[in-house]
Amino acid sequence: MKFSTAIIVSFLFIADFCAAQSGVLDISKFGGKPNSDIGQALTSAWNEACASTTAAKIVIPAGTYQLNGIELKGPCKAPIELQVDGTIQAPADPSVIKGTEQWFKFLYMDHLTLSGKGVFDGQGATVYKKAAPASAWSGKNSNSKVFMNFGFNFVNNSIVRGVTSKDSKNFHVMVFGCKNITFDGFTITAPGDSPNTDGIHMGKSTDVKILNTNIGTGDDCVSIGDGSKQITVQGVNCGPGHGLSVGSLGKFTTEENVEGITVKNCTLTATDNGVRIKTWPDAPGTITVSDIHFEDITMTNVKNPVIIDQEYYPWNQCSKKNPSKIKLSKISFKNVKGTSGTAEGVVLICSSAVPCDGVELNNVDLKFNGAPTTAKCTNVKPLVTGTAPVCQAPGAPAASTTATPAASKTATPAAGKSPAK
């Protein structure tokens, strides 16, 4: 009797184990092998997972794989986790994937998890060499015409954690039309001289969180585009790169308002810019940008640490004949400390057509060669409190000052000069 009971218990354990594993789909079971293209195997595994009425996990084991591009599309019947523990390589030849497509694209998903220790290698070195120098990239050789590493399009209630995006030929990650998507413990890496390799760019998305993430690129570590609302960037290490940016904005008539942005507890090291808002002059966009907060930011040798630039025109792509029409309001820079690579630690260049309202500098304590940095301001009178450089701008909305000034300087920016892209 005891023997029979033991057999039954063992059988039930095995049955339960098998049932628990039934939702795990290893691509090797679908023909996916290291050192070969896994497009078909991954597509087959995805189709099976997407049709499942219970949660499923797709696993790409350790090893090096090739992939010429894939679109993983929903809606699916239940949550899906894609666990990547290997290295997946994009085509080195940018012409394999046409236009501005995304190499690894997710569409119309709810409850997606992308996890693992894996690396998505965009193999961008050939593009970087072809397009140098960066200042020439606005023409036909621009890498804006080649593919990005990732696209998350209309992906909701989802998380990306643990994986690495390496050497994308264009932006690393595009987030578009998403709601409640989180990047946590994500790594993005590309050479500091790799143009247009923004880390995470988002647009027309709500409740996006970028947490505890390391980003080093040749462009903005994070760029927040139009239609972005309730965005949190927290615990991000940025460098090399062009900093943490809202914008650029105003270039197109179809743009939507930006509001509710919080950038907090971030560290920037040797970046070309720090925390920044940028809008185009002489452009048709008329949106509003409000409730933007940068707080508890640490900088080490950062050029242009604090910037509002409403005369943003990289590589002279436009004119400053007419001012920006983008209205900026309720913007704060609080507890920003560290060292600057430029004497001017704060540059606030607002629009003469719609001057900035409600800008606050609170404990902005930056040093250049051991001395406090200065401030340059146009069309804005910020409220300055604590230790911070004080600036004034005649004709702008009134603001009070209760600061312990680190320095004070009022100036008009030199013609034709704009902070680095």
Curated annotation (Swiss-Prot):
Q: Which InterPro entries match?
A: Glyco_hydro_28, PbH1, Pectin_lyas_fold, Pectin_lyase_fold/virulence
Mention one GO molecular function. polygalacturonase activity
Active-site residues, as the UniProt record annotates them = 219 (proton donor), 242
Where would I find glycosylation on this chain? 156, 180, 265
Which ranges of the sequence are coiled-coil? Answer: none
One of the protein's GO biological processes: carbohydrate metabolic process
A Pfam family (short name) is Glyco_hydro_28
The organism's superkingdom is given as Eukaryota
Where in or outside the cell it occurs: the entry states: Secreted; Secreted, Cell wall
Q: What is its EC number?
A: 3.2.1.15
Glycoprotein is among the record's keywords: yes
Residues making up the signal peptide according to the UniProt record: 1-20
In terms of PANTHER family, this protein maps to:
PTHR31375
> In its UniProt entry, what is this protein called?
Polygalacturonase
The species is Medicago sativa (Alfalfa)
